[in-house]
């Protein structure tokens, strides 16, 4: 059966996450339903990242197996026609070898978290950023973030119910971009790793926000990391500011 990779964009707000749910809307379920309108099913797709409720994506990657050979451009267009009016889009499709696996072939995942500092409620970005009503110190947050880059035991920064076999991960990059706007300052956290633990990004950003607000010192981030204790983590920030922005493979399937 021919295998296709799909690059997917979605607004996570209306969905109970990526993974198919029995009684709730999911991104996986929406795409599998659309595939069923192109070819008889059942269809099961696999994704590089199983994003949680409310988390968005601009560069999710999944793969599917189909019966017939499809022109990738036409496949993307046909799926988009059947996904309407849901906030899900197939940005690109590509024919890939049968050994390609969207999850297990991935060598890198990239996330963005958008944190907006302003007193007024957000309007145009509602549901797409995490807003805090107080100013933040970006240099303090960068100093705290520096303690987290590299290979560490991230027990403190993973969900209590995380099912990963090991809490040890290598965080390849964690950078902070400051975007000054007329109506507030946005802080964009860019994170890159081969893989992440459940709630790792939101735990890290929630903790760094406390540093930026002056409630924590940068050195307390190191102390929390070295505690290897979930109770030492700062607050877990809400999901709406988080985006899966890209997935890397040894060879780009969409090139």
From Swiss-Prot:
| Catalytic residues of the enzyme | 52
Which enzyme type, at the first EC level? isomerase
Which Pfam family name is an example for this entry? PseudoU_synth_1
- Family annotation (InterPro entries): PsdUridine_synth_cat_dom_sf, PsdUridine_synth_TruA, PsdUridine_synth_TruA_a/b_dom, PsdUridine_synth_TruA_C, TruA/RsuA/RluB/E/F_N
Annotated residues that bind substrate are located at: 111
Disulphide bonds annotated for this chain are: none
Q: Which GO terms describe its molecular function?
A: RNA binding; tRNA pseudouridine(38-40) synthase activity
Q: How does it assemble?
A: Homodimer.
- Cited function: Formation of pseudouridine at positions 38, 39 and 40 in the anticodon stem and loop of transfer RNAs.
Q: Which family does it belong to?
A: Belongs to the tRNA pseudouridine synthase TruA family.
Q: Which HAMAP family match?
A: TruA
Q: What is this protein called?
A: tRNA pseudouridine synthase A
């Amino acid at each position: 059966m021919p295998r296709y990779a799909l690059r997917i964009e979605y607004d996570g707000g209306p969905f109970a996450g990526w993974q198919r749910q029995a009684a709730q809307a999911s991104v996986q379920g929406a795409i599998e339903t659309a595939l069923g309108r192109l070819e008889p099913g059942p269809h099961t797709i696999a994704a590089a990242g199983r994003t949680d409720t409310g988390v968005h994506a601009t560069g999710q990657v999944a793969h599917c197996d189909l019966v017939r050979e499809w022109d990738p451009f036409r496949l993307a267009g046909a799926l988009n026609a059947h996904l309407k009016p849901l906030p899900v889009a197939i940005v690109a499709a590509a024919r890939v070898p049968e050994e390609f696996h969207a999850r297990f072939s991935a060598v890198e995942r990239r996330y963005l978290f958008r944190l907006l500092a302003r007193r007024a409620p957000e309007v145009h970005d509602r549901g797409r950023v995490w807003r805090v009503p107080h100013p933040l110190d970006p240099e303090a947050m960068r100093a705290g973030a520096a303690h987290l880059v590299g290979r560490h035991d991230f027990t403190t920064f993973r969900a209590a119910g995380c099912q990963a076999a090991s809490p040890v991960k290598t965080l390849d990059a964690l950078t902070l971009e400051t975007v000054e706007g007329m109506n507030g300052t946005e802080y964009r956290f860019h994170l890159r790793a081969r893989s992440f633990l459940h709630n790792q990004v939101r735990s890290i950003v929630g903790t760094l926000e406390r540093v930026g607000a002056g409630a924590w010192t940068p050195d307390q981030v190191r102390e929390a990391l070295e505690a290897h204790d979930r109770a030492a983590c700062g607050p877990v920030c809400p999901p709406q500011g988080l985006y899966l922005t890209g997935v890397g493979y040894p060879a780009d399937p969409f090139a």
